[in-house]
Amino acid sequence: MMAIRELKVCLLGDTGVGKSSIVCRFVQDHFDHNISPTIGASFMTKTVPCGNELHKFLIWDTAGQERFHSLAPMYYRGSAAAVIVYDITKQDSFHTLKKWVKELKEHGPENIVMAIAGNKCDLSDIREVPLKDAKEYAESIGAIVVETSAKNAINIEELFQGISRQIPPLGPQENGNSGGIKLGNQSLQASRRCC
């Protein structure tokens, strides 16, 4: 029987870059042309095989609007990975991506896997962000970089497979461990002392 690992993943980025569309395409293999902006955050799951394990992605799709920015730490806290999404047709979204990366490095989990998704690659004829720039930036921060199209289902699976490959496998002693706090039995007598 394969071990199932739950991996919390959050999606960050400007409003309108396609975070929700990426999640819908990955989880439901569906694209909605009229998707509404996310309010706060939404949550979906999908389990995929990775080596001798199953990775159950617990995906938090965060709102991109500035007014919801202060909620983001609640979603990336404890995350195994973060997908920072930008729109290849909007240079501003790539600049905002760098702010998200800075915030993750300062306040996120120490060993978080970072993936950069340049979404809307189906619109490459109106591209503002060269892939070369994204690759150089990703390399400078040790992140995965993938250009995606949620609309045309390009590289969506590859994005999450790339994240899976970056997650270290469980060691033999960790199999079956939920990762929670271990409680041990200690003698109460030793701890009962008067001040």
Swiss-Prot record:
Its cofactor is Mg(2+). This is Ras-related protein Rab-31. It comes from Mus musculus (Mouse). A motif (Switch 1) lies at residues 30-42. It comes from the Eukaryota. Switch 1, switch 2 and the interswitch regions are characteristic of Rab GTPases and mediate the interactions with Rab downstream effectors. The switch regions undergo conformational changes upon nucleotide binding which drive interaction with specific sets of effector proteins, with most effectors only binding to GTP-bound Rab. Regulated by guanine nucleotide exchange factors (GEFs) including RIN3 and GAPVD1 which promote the exchange of bound GDP for free GTP. Regulated by GTPase activating proteins (GAPs) which increase the GTP hydrolysis activity. Inhibited by GDP dissociation inhibitors (GDIs) which prevent Rab-GDP dissociation. The gene is Rab31. GTP binds at residues 16, 18-21, 32-33, 38, 64, 119, 122, 150-151.
